[in-house]
Each structure stands twice: as C-alpha cells, then as structure tokens.
Amino acid sequence: MPILDTPYASLDLIRQPEQPNEPLQAFDAADEYLLATLHGQGLPAATRVLILNDSFGALACALAAHVEVTSSGDSHLAHLALQKNLARNDLPADRVRFVPASEAAQGPFDRVLIRVPKTLSLLEEQLIRLHDQLAPGAQVIAAAMIKHLPRAAGDLLEQYIGPVQASLAVKKARLLSATPVDKPAPQSPYPTRYQLDQPKLELLNHANLFCREGLDIGTRAFLPHLPKALGAIRVADLGCGNGVLGIVYALGNPQAELTLVDESYMAVQSARENWQVILGERPADIRAGDGLAEQPPGSLDLVLCNPPFHQQQVVGDFLAWRMFTQAKAALTKGGELWIVGNRHLGYHLKLKRLFGNAEQVAATPKFVVLRSIKA
C-alpha cells in the first residue's frame, strides 16, 4: 500500500472494510494538502484539534503524536479504521479521542479540520454544533478533492462560521478556510420527520440519513412484501437506517427478537428513537457495527437488507457482497435473507452464487425483492 508522507509522520494506512488487492488508498491529496498547510502555519503542542469526517484516520494519525486530537464522524467503519491505523503505526490509542457524530464533541477547539462529507446536511449539523465549541482565535479549515466539493459547502461555512477564503488547487484538491465571527446561536433543522402511509407511522431522521425527507423508493418497494413469518424468531435489519424495515416487521410479529445494525451512528440513533416511540420498551438490540461481523454464527433466522451501493464517494457492490456473506454466516440452517435492490445491480446472480438459490419475490420496473435460503 502507498505510504502517506507528511511533515508530521510517514504512515502506513489501510481502509475499512479491508478487501483483497484493495485498489484504493486510505488517503488522498486533500489530506496531504491540509497537513502541509497546517505545518506551514505552525501547530503548537497545546493546540486542541477537532477533526471531522476523517474517513480512515489519516489526519488523526498524522497529528496524534503532536497535538491534542478529537476525531468525530458518523462512520463506525471510519472509527474502526482509525483504531487499526493507530495500532498499525505504533501510535497509542489514547492519543485520539473519538466522538460519534450522534453526540456533540466537547470543546473548546483551536483548529477544526473538516473533510467535506458527501451529505451536506451532515456538514450543516456539524457546523451548527461548532457555535459554542470554538476557542478565541480558532480557525476552521475544510478540505476536499475539487470533484467532490460543491459550492454549497463554502456557503454553509460562511453561513455558520464566517468569511471563507478558498485556496489555490493543488493536485486537484482545495481548502476552504473560514474565520469565525460572532453570530446568533443557530437553530438546527435536524432531525427531520416524515409520515409513512402503510402502516401509518411518523419516522425521525438525523442529519446523515439516506433519504432523510421521505421513504426511499427501494424500501417502499420492499415493505409490502416483507416475510410473514411469525413466532419467536431471531431477525436482523442489516443496514437499518432509521429502522423502518425492522420496526414494520416487528409490528407484524410481536414475538420476534429484533437486531437492528448500521455503520452510521446517526442511523442507529434514529432507529433507537423511532423504536422507542413506536414500540416502547419492547427489547431490541440496536447498535452501530460492521454489519453482522460480530454476530455469532447461526444465531439468526431471518435477515432483512436494503444494501447500500456506495461508501462516501466510492460506488460499487463490495459493501452489498460483504453484507450478504455476513448474513449467510449469521443465519441458521434454513434461515432466510430477504433483500431489495436495483434490477441493474444483478444481486440475484450474487445471491445464487453465495447461497445456491435466489427467488424473486416481487418486482417493480426498477427494483426486485429477492429471497435466499441457507442450506
């Protein structure tokens, strides 16, 4: 793997989830540009640094031995990458404090370093939280590859922080430096809510949720065809988002034992709050995790899944394939995986290869609902 050479450290970094013959590296030119700029400015050892959305820990690992670092983001996989990369580079784990994006970091901070996320509502929520977290003279710097830097990111920095200065481009990366000014305390528009018609439910969604303003069309295609199995079976909603699949299934099967898991901390927080409002004190295991990686083998009877096909800006079916293989391992003999996916992604071929069978349960012009049974 390529080495990240910075003025602070040379780092051997890996991505998460790990893939054989990984074609992508765990850092980019925006990380390099940001670290070089910080070094040029000077960074005293007493500097309190907050890093937001550090995908695989490149920024935190580079600075860990030099300043006080807090890292915050919405990805459990990013947190896992940070832990592994600290260990891989012989850096003490306690040099970096990690705070899930579902919680507020505790300032004040002298420098805030932001990797601009794909979802600008997440960036907006993070900037709103900075209102009372900045020390006098603090500086906020956002970094991105130019192809992933929308104009709206600069507008949000100016709206919530202060005047923005854009850097020159270096290796197709750009920095946006914002100078904090006094502003009235902003009101967050998050979480948002939408109404579900069948069944009639109101669902809450924190800032980084996919299809935050309404039910996504894949889930809409899946809900009428959820399995009708009843009784005390063990069911997982894999990649649960706001929990809608697991919650609707649980309403139809009062005896089922539910696990809802997602790698997004804000998704898990949304699912917990929705479960509490709709199902009250009914027990459920709702957690952030690397899919079903920590689920005991043979411990589930049914897995429901609407798999993602991107990780940040990277598009591919590697996450779906990983979820399918995890589901197979976690299912008991005769257990079933039910998924919904875009027709063009060809998930039926992957499921048939993995399980030896794949049945089309339902279809729309764009989506298919598929079922595979573990032999």
Swiss-Prot record:
Main location: cytoplasm
Gene3D superfamilies: Vaccinia Virus protein VP39
Xref: InterPro entries: DNA_methylase_N6_adenine_CS, rRNA_m2G-MeTrfase_RlmG, RsmC/RlmG, SAM-dependent_MTases_sf, Small_mtfrase_dom
Catalytic activity: guanosine(1835) in 23S rRNA + S-adenosyl-L-methionine = N(2)-methylguanosine(1835) in 23S rRNA + S-adenosyl-L-homocysteine + H(+)
Subcellular location: Cytoplasm
GO molecular function list: 23S rRNA (guanine(1835)-N(2))-methyltransferase activity; nucleic acid binding
Keyword vocabulary terms for this entry: Cytoplasm, Methyltransferase, rRNA processing, S-adenosyl-L-methionine, Transferase
Enzyme Commission number: 2.1.1.174
UniProt GO cellular component terms: cytoplasm
Membership in a protein family: Belongs to the methyltransferase superfamily. RlmG family.
Protein name: Ribosomal RNA large subunit methyltransferase G
Organism: Stutzerimonas stutzeri (strain A1501) (Pseudomonas stutzeri)
Gene from which the chain derives: rlmG
